[in-house]
Amino acid sequence: MAATMMGVATQTREETEPEAEPAGPDIRQYVVVDRSLGMSAGKVAAQVAHASVAALLAGTQRYVEGDPTCGPIGLEWGGSLARTSVDAGVLAEWVRQGEPKIVLAVDGERALAALVSRAESRGFMEGMDFFCIRDACRTELTPDASGSRWTCVGFAPMVVSAISPVTGQLPLYR
């Protein structure tokens, strides 16, 4: 109900705020970085960015190649409707929640490998649920025998309760 102050009608806060949408499950995207590499802040940011977009780009690539299991995300790319392997409902809720990302840390490639092993033991698949990011070593890092360096693992956006058994014990990257 509008209140009157000095002859001017005003609306109460309850009248002007839209009703909050019901809260969906917490959805986050996790990226786990190997901090033992001593990357600069800019290099870490670039590697996390690669990991963050990998889920959408990998799914989009599968759609372009004709994989019918990818769900629509409503983006046009190359004249086609882009699709991703991320569940459309999860993706929509993640976007609604502000696309939250959490960056965690491990120390060393063995720790990254252990993380991948935990993920696979829970049924997660590389190239669909998580992405191993390797740097081309053109700027800061020294390549390993493969000619690149494994820097991080990025997970597709997912319900926190699904990913917590894999990442829950890891510290935040600082």
Model-identified regions with their sequence ranges:
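Positively charged, small/polar-rich N-terminal and surface patches that mediate targeting and assembly
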Residues: 1-174
